[in-house]
Amino acid sequence: GMASTAGSVLGKLAKTAIGIL
């Protein structure tokens, strides 16, 4: 649902940020 979708998006953003840093 909404929670899992939000978690997935946050996970992708976190991985992207880590990749950039």
UniProtKB/Swiss-Prot annotation:
GO terms for biological process: defense response. The keyword rRNA-binding does not apply. It is found in: Secreted. Keywords: Amidation, Amphibian defense peptide, Antimicrobial, Secreted. The modification Leucine amide is found at L21. One of its GO terms (cellular component) is extracellular region. Expressed by the skin glands. The keyword Repeat does not apply. Antimicrobial peptide. Belongs to the gastrin/cholecystokinin family. Magainin subfamily. This is Peptide PGLa-R6.
